[in-house]
Amino acid sequence: MLKSQLQQQLKKLKDNNLYRFLRKNNSYNNKNYLDFSSNDYLCLSTNKEIIDAIKEGGLKYGFGSTGSRLTAGDINHQLLEHKIAEFKGTERSLIYSSGYATNVGVISALCKKGDLILSDKLNHASIIDGCKLSKSAVLIYNHCDMDNLIDLIEKNRSSYNNLFIITDGVFSMDGDIAPLDKLKKIADEYNGILIIDDAHGTGVLGNGKGSLKHFNLKPSDNIIQIGTMSKAVGGLGGFVCGIEEVIEYLINTSRSFIYSTSLPPSVVSGCIKSFELIEEGAPTKKLQKNIGLANKIFKEHNLIEENNLTPIYPFIFKEKTMDIAEQLIKNNIFCVGIRYPTVPKGMERLRVSITVGHSEEDFRVLCERINLIIKKKFKGI
């Protein structure tokens, strides 16, 4: 019964061109393979100093953590938490096994029945799932639309206890930045708490410190910062930063923290070194220089209209997106095609991620191949 049901559902996905599958990424085996899909913005996943730190951590502490943080799995983890809190300028931080686990664990623990969540329409799936797991009422405001947000708050605020405004710092599919300065003012005015998922802002904006620093905003009692170590940091895991009471409460109530085996200590050692390198500033400066170069070249080839501040570029090709992505692979370029339900129908795009490892020639090759594919296969778009 289950097998036949799943077969029918999989067939439906294939018929609607929505079927997902795992593809072998040859970029590590083929030096002629251009990778524009990676979130390793600062190329720290292959940094020698970090790899040496990982080796040292493995030799010192062993392969795995062997337990959750509240049992046997608290090894060098508090050293990393101290480093992250120092880096972000907050009282405390807490690390989780992934960015997804962080959002789900933080939101479901803090947001309760009788509370109200206002969530941006384009927030990451992990935020959406965290909201679903909470007992709070959830309202969605139009993407970065402050008037719509204020309208929803004024119509609903008086009926609830705590107000939570939740947003990505940098939106993962479009690369745009949430107006945190305006969101902070709104949170202050309506006695709300602002939760920022800065997965794609940490290491990228604000001299590496993230989206909050980009707006010259300081951490405060009503701001909770969430991040990941799997993007610019180049490693694995997630973290949350905030005041002492928030972190202590999460240690006692956040289920994805309490019931997960902690990160391997070797990974923790690598992440500590990575934050040290990011704090020096050089990797982020190099990335911003490359973003400026990419802006220039992508504009020349009519692939973008406005300059980006982040390394995420959406090239919207709608229903032709997946075909273009397949043709790029045949041309030794890995650039992920993103389609519904990750993005709305009619907004299918190539999600181009640039890193410090890309050169001017790499950007030009990508543009030329895309335009050639469009010309040959689609007779232009």
Swiss-Prot record:
Reactions performed catalytically: 6-carboxyhexanoyl-[ACP] + L-alanine + H(+) = (8S)-8-amino-7-oxononanoate + holo-[ACP] + CO2
Top-level EC class: transferase
Pfam families, sorted: Aminotran_1_2 (PF00155)
EC code(s) of this entry: 2.3.1.47
UniProt pathway: Cofactor biosynthesis; biotin biosynthesis
GO molecular function: 8-amino-7-oxononanoate synthase activity; pyridoxal phosphate binding
Domain of life: Archaea
Similarity-based family: Belongs to the class-II pyridoxal-phosphate-dependent aminotransferase family. BioF subfamily.
InterPro entries membership: Aminotrans_II_pyridoxalP_BS, Aminotransferase_I/II_large, AON_synthase_class-II, AONS_Archaea/Proteobacteria, PyrdxlP-dep_Trfase, PyrdxlP-dep_Trfase_major, PyrdxlP-dep_Trfase_small
UniProt keyword terms in alphabetical order: Biotin biosynthesis, Pyridoxal phosphate, Transferase
PROSITE patterns per the UniProt record, alphabetical: AA_TRANSFER_CLASS_2
Binding-site residues for pyridoxal 5'-phosphate, renumbered to this chain: G99, Y100, S172, D197, D198, A199, H200, T228, M229, S230, K231
Cofactor (UniProt): pyridoxal 5'-phosphate
Purpose: Catalyzes the decarboxylative condensation of pimeloyl-[acyl-carrier protein] and L-alanine to produce 8-amino-7-oxononanoate (AON), [acyl-carrier protein], and carbon dioxide.
Residues found modified as N6-(pyridoxal phosphate)lysine: K231
Name assigned to this protein: Putative 8-amino-7-oxononanoate synthase
One GO process term, biological-process aspect: biotin biosynthetic process
Record note on quaternary structure: Homodimer.
Chain positions recorded as substrate binding sites: R20, H124, T342
